[in-house]
């Protein structure tokens, strides 16, 4: 008798995606992050759902409702901190996942890569709107500063900002709509994930060597299910350690002060996972230029496939490209550090140099090194 998982219309889809999926035999732990991101999304949706049952999206009661969740709701504190720190875990996995794609040339699967970029934007938008919901000082001023950037758009800028605000400042209407979109977007993200996987399974997975592995495939289960479970245990250990021992480590103390439109915090900054983009934004003196650089800091990933000049897909056998890749990683750490510092000497100039280096590596140096390595291979 044929196994039900191979014949049932619904189970067949799951079977072909998780059980009998042919996978390259050489996948390393860098290929774990897709499943970890799926788990992160599930955790965020579940904790968010339970938080939404107790949260009120009204400027008068939002801050108090979060306090109520932490103090009075059964295990509300763990829900709140799992959700807040789960977002950090989400972004750690996201950035490692994108980094893996850049290193091993997975961007050559353009459909999968482009859906991935859309997913990255969607997750960033969701995280930004979620940060506004507790209605602390940094929530309010972060929302004001970031939405105000749209006023740099010529002609329609000011109208656009007031349309998003639902008034002449960040107020009740803004909070309500941000809550609505913050609730909606994860489900849209879930749908996009399905499309992401659909395109991935059209081409099959890449592997560390960048060489086609059609001749050497193994079933996803049990080999990679076990491997993914190990990654999951490590991630859950890290997340639960963070939540149970220092839940406010990655947060901002200013967010424990209720939002006050009359009092500006000394340093307005977003959560740590946006600091690199925030540093790029601040490093350009012109407002419109800064906004364009901010958007391009992520959108630049979309043109990476067009800039691939090497004859090899992966960087595994390309030491010069590897050096450049790790320079890019170091540069992103520098930008993240600069984004959290005040706007003064020497941080301004460091931020500007790091921003120029970021775009130079991706747009100029990587393609040039690829061409150079092609010539070196002829010797």
Curated annotation (Swiss-Prot):
Recorded GO MF terms: metal ion binding; ubiquinol-cytochrome-c reductase activity
Record GO biological process: mitochondrial electron transport, ubiquinol to cytochrome c
Protein's membrane topology: Multi-pass membrane protein
Assembly mode: The cytochrome bc1 complex contains 11 subunits: 3 respiratory subunits (MT-CYB, CYC1 and UQCRFS1), 2 core proteins (UQCRC1 and UQCRC2) and 6 low-molecular weight proteins (UQCRH/QCR6, UQCRB/QCR7, UQCRQ/QCR8, UQCR10/QCR9, UQCR11/QCR10 and a cleavage product of UQCRFS1). This cytochrome bc1 complex then forms a dimer.
UniProtKB keywords: Electron transport, Heme, Iron, Membrane, Metal-binding, Mitochondrion, Mitochondrion inner membrane, Respiratory chain, Transmembrane, Transmembrane helix, Transport, Ubiquinone
The encoding gene: MT-CYB
Annotated residues for binding of heme b b562: 83, 182
A Pfam entry, by short name: Cytochrom_B_C
Bound cofactor: record note: Binds 2 heme b groups non-covalently.
List of residues binding a ubiquinone: 201
Other information: Heme 1 (or BL or b562) is low-potential and absorbs at about 562 nm, and heme 2 (or BH or b566) is high-potential and absorbs at about 566 nm.
Entry annotated with the keyword Iron: yes
GO cellular component: mitochondrial inner membrane; respiratory chain complex III
Its job: Component of the ubiquinol-cytochrome c reductase complex (complex III or cytochrome b-c1 complex) that is part of the mitochondrial respiratory chain. The b-c1 complex mediates electron transfer from ubiquinol to cytochrome c. Contributes to the generation of a proton gradient across the mitochondrial membrane that is then used for ATP synthesis.
The protein's name in its UniProt record: Cytochrome b
Location in or out of the cell: Mitochondrion inner membrane
Entry-linked InterPro entries: Cyt_b/b6_C, Cyt_b/b6_C_sf, Cyt_b/b6_N, Cytb/b6-like_sf, Cytochrome_b, Cytochrome_b_C_euk/bac, Cytochrome_b_N_euk/bac, Di-haem_cyt_TM
Binding site for heme b b566: 97, 196
Organism: Micronycteris minuta
CDD domains reported for this sequence: cytochrome_b_C, Cytochrome_b_N
């Amino acid at each position: 008798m044929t196994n039900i998982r191979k014949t049932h219309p619904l189970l067949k889809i799951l079977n072909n995606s998780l059980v009998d999926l042919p996978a390259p035999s050489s996948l390393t732990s860098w290929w774990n992050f897709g499943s970890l991101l799926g788990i992160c999304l599930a955790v965020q949706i579940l904790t968010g759902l339970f938080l939404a049952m107790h949260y009120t999206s009204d400027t008068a009661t939002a801050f108090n409702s979060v306090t109520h969740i932490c103090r009075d709701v059964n295990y509300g504190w763990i829900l709140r901190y799992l959700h807040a720190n789960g977002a950090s875990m989400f972004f750690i996995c996201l950035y490692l996942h994108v980094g893996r794609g850049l290193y091993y040339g997975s961007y050559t699967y353009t459909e999968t890569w482009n859906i991935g970029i859309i997913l990255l934007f969607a997750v960033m938008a969701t995280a930004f709107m979620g940060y506004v919901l507790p209605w602390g000082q940094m929530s309010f001023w972060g929302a004001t500063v970031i939405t105000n950037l749209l006023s740099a758009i010529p002609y329609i800028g000011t109208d656009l900002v007031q349309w998003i605000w639902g008034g002449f400042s960040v107020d009740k209407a803004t909070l309500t709509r941000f809550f609505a979109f913050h609730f909606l977007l994860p489900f849209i993200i879930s749908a996009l994930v399905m499309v992401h996987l659909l395109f991935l399974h059209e081409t099959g997975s890449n592997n560390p060597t960048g060489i086609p592995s059609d001749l050497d495939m193994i079933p996803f289960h049990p080999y990679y299910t076990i491997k993914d479970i190990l990654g999951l245990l490590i991630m859950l250990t890290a997340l639960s350690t963070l939540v149970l021992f220092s839940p406010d480590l990655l947060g901002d103390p200013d967010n424990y002060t209720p939002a006050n439109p009359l009092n500006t915090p000394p340093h307005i900054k977003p959560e740590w996972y946006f600091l690199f983009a925030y540093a790029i934004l601040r490093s350009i003196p012109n407002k419109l230029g800064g906004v364009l650089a901010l958007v391009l800091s992520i959108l630049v990933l979309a043109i990476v496939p067009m800039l691939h000049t090497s004859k090899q897909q992966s960087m595994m056998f390309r030491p010069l490209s590897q050096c450049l890749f790790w320079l890019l990683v170091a540069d992103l750490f520098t930008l993240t550090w600069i984004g959290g510092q005040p706007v003064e000497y020497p941080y301004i100039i460091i931020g500007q140099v790091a921003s120029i280096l970021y775009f130079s590596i991706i747009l100029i140096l990587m393609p040039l090194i690829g061409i150079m390595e092609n010539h070196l291979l002829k010797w």
